[in-house]
């Protein structure tokens, strides 16, 4: 994100995301056809950054990055969960602390039949796991 929008802290990224508009960045299914005869939601992303133009603001780009990261994580999780017939995925790590990414998980739950759970203080799960692994040694 630093090369694209000049910021690299979660706080700054979240601030930018709050003012962004994905309609200025992502190409949606609804942008490609007017008839609406689709088996999937017209609001799903067809191409991340598919509508990027010189008019996009840093806020739009920040939200586009967060959305792309969230959608990538969500879809990989959906495909992995489906291959094992799992309906619930628990997400942990620093990215779960970014509201714009969490919103992606909320939006995609209904579309793909997988429930995403983000525990409280989930950004610390990796550290806790490492500490517990060290104790077991």
Regions found by a protein language model. Name each.
Residues 1-25:
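Glycine-rich phosphate-binding loop plus the immediately following alpha-helix
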Residues 43-53, 99-112:
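Acidic-glycine-rich active-site phosphate/pyrophosphate-binding loop
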Residues 78-108, 122-123:
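Glycine-rich phosphate-binding loops at beta-strand->alpha-helix junctions
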Residues 56-60, 109-117:
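Glycine/charged-rich beta-loop-alpha catalytic/anionic-binding loops adjacent to active sites
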Residues 1-5, 116-137:
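Glycine-rich phosphate-binding/hydrolytic loop that grips phosphoryl groups
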Residues 17, 27-30, 38-43:
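Carbohydrate-associated surface elements
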């Amino acid at each position: 994100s630093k090369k694209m929008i000049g910021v690299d802290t979660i706080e700054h990224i979240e601030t930018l995301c709050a003012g962004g508009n994905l309609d200025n960045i992502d190409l949606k299914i609804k942008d490609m056809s007017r008839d609406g005869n689709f088996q999937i939601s017209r609001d799903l992303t067809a191409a991340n950054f598919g509508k990027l133009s010189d008019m996009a603001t840093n806020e739009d780009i920040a939200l586009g990055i967060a959305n792309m990261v969230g959608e990538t994580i969500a879809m990989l999780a959906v495909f992995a969960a489906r291959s094992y017939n799992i309906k619930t995925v628990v997400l942990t790590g620093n990215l779960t602390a970014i509201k714009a990414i969490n919103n992606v998980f909320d939006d995609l739950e209904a579309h793909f039949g997988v429930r995403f759970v983000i525990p409280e203080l989930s950004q610390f799960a990796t550290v806790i796991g490492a500490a517990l692994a060290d104790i077991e040694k």
